[in-house]
Structures are given as C-alpha cells and as structure tokens.
C-alpha cells in the first residue's frame, strides 16, 4: 500500500468512508466489498481482514476525521451535553434534560465499547471477507425494512410529544428534550444495538435507528440519537488505534492519510447535514432496497468470478 496507494485513491476511499459511515449502509461492509469487486491491486492493498495491513492505519485517520465532522456539526449539542454531564457529577443527581441525555449517551456507549475491545479484531479477521460482508449487507436490508414495519406498529406512541410543550419548541434542543425522556434502560438497549455493527455489512447508524424506532422514537429523533451515540464510539476507535498510524503500519502514507481524512471530514459533514434533514420526513426504505440490491448483486458477482 505504501508504494501503490495514490492520492486520488486515498481521496476516493476517504470520501466513500465519510458517506457510508453515516448512511445506514455499513461503511465496513463497503470497505470489504468494494476492493474485492474492483479487484486488482485494490483487493490486495485495501484489505481490512489482513492482520498487518497498512490500510488499517489509513482507516484510523478516516475514523478520526468522521468523528471530527460529527463534533463540528453537533457542536452546540455537545456543549450542552458535556455541561450537563459535569453538572450531574457535581450535584450527584440528574435534574435537567441535558444531564439525562448525557447519561443516555454514556450508558448507550458502554456495551459497544466493551464488545469492541473484545470482539472487533476477531470479527474483522474472520468475517471481514467479501462473501460474509455481502450476506450481512442483505441482513442489514432486512433489519432496515423490519424497522419500518415496527415503526408503523408503534407510530401512535412515537408521535405523542414526550415534552408537554414540545409543540412550542423548535429545532435541535426540542429533539434533545424528547430524547431525554427515554428511560435509561432504553438508552442501553439502543446503544447495545451498535454491537451488531461490528459485523461487516451491518450499519451502525441503521441498526441504532431501527432500535430507536422499535422503542417508539420518530425517524428524526432516532437518527439524531444514532449520530450522537456514534460520535464517542467512532472517536474512541480512532484515538485508540492512533499508535498504528504513527507506527510501522503508517510509515510512508502520511500524505495519503491527510488527503483521505480531509475528504472523509467533508463528506461526513455533508452526509450528516443531509440525513438530519432527510429523516424529518422520510424513511429507511430506500436504504433497505439499496442494501438488498447491493448485497444480492455482490453475492452473485462473487459466485460467478
């Protein structure tokens, strides 16, 4: 990879990562499938299952860039959430919506954080191959469609405003106040759904949005909670593996990492901006169709090669 990955390839991969990390289509699944389908040196250089692949160091930079884009987009929310978190520690109780939302994110992050430390490398090396990724992408399609079916069943509950004067509130703070009404145990369940995204082909944002719909959230609030939950996990995953970026695996690819990270940041920012508006009025169905087509076509292509 050091000698072969061009800046154009780095930018293309970075942009692709930034979009697929937040769209409910699985960035890891695409990171496995696209090089295999393209073939040639991409299949050799861009391998996530190889134990010592330099591509793993490259991905670290992209994860940090994606998390940075989420932090920039939601910076006002994170200022309030962090203030609420430290306020709750100082007063030793949860009193406000911001404090409650902070702890919902904390309890929702712990399960996937522990599972990631224990299982990420095992899943990546054993299942990070084209056929399992395509199969899980099909399963992701089923999950997204099932989420829409469940949403219709609980729609009367989800449409009731959780905050008494919610109709007088507008924008992000109103959504955060609605999210703060979730019981902590539901926050744990929605956050724990991210564990499934360790499987290549299962989307982190998709599975948490589905879990949110299942627990009665609207599409808008489920997507917002999904992106807030994803931020600390994506950032922690990147920071945890930064030594790989500056170690032997990252030798000679600093320029490519920077170029790819810039592309990833820009595309992730545009993606989250688009999706937060998209889910105000629309559903997961188009993404379910895409995953079904992409997963099925990939399986057929791989079988015929």
Swiss-Prot record:
Catalysed reaction per UniProt? di-trans,octa-cis-undecaprenyl diphosphate + H2O = di-trans,octa-cis-undecaprenyl phosphate + phosphate + H(+)
InterPro entries, per database record: UppP
Gene name of this polypeptide:
uppP
PANTHER family (alphabetical): UNDECAPRENYL-DIPHOSPHATASE
Q: What is this protein called?
A: Undecaprenyl-diphosphatase
Which NCBIfam families does the entry link to? PRK00281.3-1 (NF001395)
Family, similarity comment: Belongs to the UppP family.
Q: Which domain of life is it from?
A: Bacteria
* The organism of origin for this protein: Mycobacterium avium (strain 104)
UniProt GO MF annotations:
undecaprenyl-diphosphatase activity
Q: Which UniProt keywords apply?
A: Antibiotic resistance, Cell membrane, Cell shape, Cell wall biogenesis/degradation, Hydrolase, Membrane, Peptidoglycan synthesis, Transmembrane, Transmembrane helix
Query: What Enzyme Commission number(s) appear in the record?
Result: 3.6.1.27
Membrane topology recorded in Swiss-Prot or TrEMBL: Multi-pass membrane protein
Q: Give an example GO biological process.
A: response to antibiotic
The note filed under miscellaneous reads:
Bacitracin is thought to be involved in the inhibition of peptidoglycan synthesis by sequestering undecaprenyl diphosphate, thereby reducing the pool of lipid carrier available.
Per UniProt, subcellular location reads as: Cell membrane
Annotated Pfam families: BacA
Free-text function comment from the UniProt entry: Catalyzes the dephosphorylation of undecaprenyl diphosphate (UPP). Confers resistance to bacitracin.
Q: Where are the transmembrane segments?
A: 18-38, 55-75, 103-123, 130-150, 187-207, 225-245, 246-266, 284-304
Uppermost EC category:
hydrolase
CC annotations in GO: plasma membrane
């Amino acid at each position: 990879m050091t000698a072969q990955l061009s800046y154009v390839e780095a930018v293309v991969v970075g942009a692709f990562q930034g979009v697929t990390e937040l769209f409910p289509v699985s960035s890891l699944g695409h990171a496995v499938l696209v090089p295999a389908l393209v073939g040639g040196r991409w299949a050799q250089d861009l391998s996530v299952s190889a134990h010592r692949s330099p591509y793993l160091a490259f991905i670290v930079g992209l994860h940090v860039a994606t998390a940075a884009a989420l932090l920039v987009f939601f910076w006002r929310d994170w200022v309030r959430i962090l203030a609420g978190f430290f306020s709750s520690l100082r007063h030793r109780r949860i009193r406000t919506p911001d404090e409650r939302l902070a702890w919902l994110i904390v309890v929702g992050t712990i399960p996937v954080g522990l599972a990631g430390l224990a299982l990420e490398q095992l899943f990546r090396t054993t299942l990070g191959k084209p056929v399992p990724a395509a199969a899980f992408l099909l399963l992701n399609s089923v999950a997204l469609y099932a989420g829409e079916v469940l949403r219709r069943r609980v729609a009367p509950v989800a449409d009731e405003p959780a905050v008494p004067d919610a109709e007088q509130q507008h924008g992000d703070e109103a959504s955060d106040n609605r999210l703060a009404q979730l019981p902590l145990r539901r926050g744990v369940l929605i956050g724990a759904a991210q564990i499934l995204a360790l499987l290549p082909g299962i989307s982190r944002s998709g599975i948490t949005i589905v879990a949110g719909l299942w627990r009665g959230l609207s599409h808008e609030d489920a997507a917002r909670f999904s992106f807030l939950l994803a931020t600390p996990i994506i950032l922690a995953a990147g920071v945890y593996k930064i030594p790989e970026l500056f170690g032997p695996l990252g030798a000679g690819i600093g320029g490519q990492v920077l170029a790819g990270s810039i592309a990833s940041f820009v595309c992730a920012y545009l993606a989250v901006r688009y999706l937060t508006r998209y889910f105000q009025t629309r559903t997961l169905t188009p993404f379910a169709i895409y995953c079904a087509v992409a997963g099925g076509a990939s399986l057929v292509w791989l079988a015929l090669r």
